[in-house]
Amino acid sequence: MAAAAAPRSSGKEALPAALGSASEPPRLFDGTTRLYICYFCPFAQRAWIIRNFKGLQDKIELVGIDLQDKPAWYKEKVYEQGTVPSLEHNGKIMGESLDLIKYIDSHFEGPALLPEDPEKRQFADELIAYANAFTKALYSPLISKADLSAETVAALDKIEAALSKFGDGPFFLGQFSLVDIAYVTIIERIQIYYSHIRKYEITNGRPNLEKFIEEINRIEAYTQTKNDPLYLLDLAKTHLKVA
């Protein structure tokens, strides 16, 4: 898979204010493609990253949703599950972040983020399918305040090994792909949480993961979507009760 080159960017875009309970909905199904996100949600961040990487800022409008003061119209008129992200496109609404990143990759212009190589494609499918289990393995001990489990360590070791499968780059498939988008928003947060709360550095003894984090922070489409680490830590302590 050749390296996917992201379109040039002028830096962070001016984000619209997140819409709360007192807000009015946008004019739905008026032909505008809209991506509904929460600016600090790791799942919504996945869709936000691919939008930016493919250079779709002028094609997909961001609509921020305040999850702490969620507007009733979002669940009633937009996405009945009430979660983010969701995408309004061609008169339809769809959700689930791992499905959305695949949809955006295949239905919009810009660099392709899944490989044609059959071996890499199969590995990509396997890793994307594992992403939810990885998230659960890393978040569960934090939320339950349990000790660092063998399952948690095994999940980190699994992605460390996965990052060594292909030698043509620092990412899961060598070059940047949907797999990296599926994992980076979770890795971003667990690195902060485990370091500050458990005094455990997830990169210790995992050089591939350390290199992955270093290199993905050179990708502007990702860094444009990041929040301040201490802000994310405060949110986790407040809303997930992880402290």
UniProtKB/Swiss-Prot annotation:
One of its GO terms (molecular function) is glutathione transferase activity. Residues 31-112 form the GST N-terminal domain. Residues 117-240 form the GST C-terminal domain. It comes from the Eukaryota. CDD domains: GST_C_Lambda (cd03203). Pfam families: GST_C_2 (PF13410), GST_N_3 (PF13417). InterPro entries: Glutathione-S-Trfase_C_sf (IPR036282), Glutathione_S-Trfase (IPR040079), Glutathione_S-Trfase_N (IPR004045), GSTL1/2/3 (IPR044629), Thioredoxin-like_sf (IPR036249). Glutathione binds at K70, V84, E96, S97. Coiled coil: none annotated. Belongs to the GST superfamily. HSP26 family. This is Protein IN2-1 homolog A. It comes from Oryza sativa subsp. japonica (Rice). The lineage of its organism: Eukaryota, Viridiplantae, Streptophyta, Embryophyta, Tracheophyta.
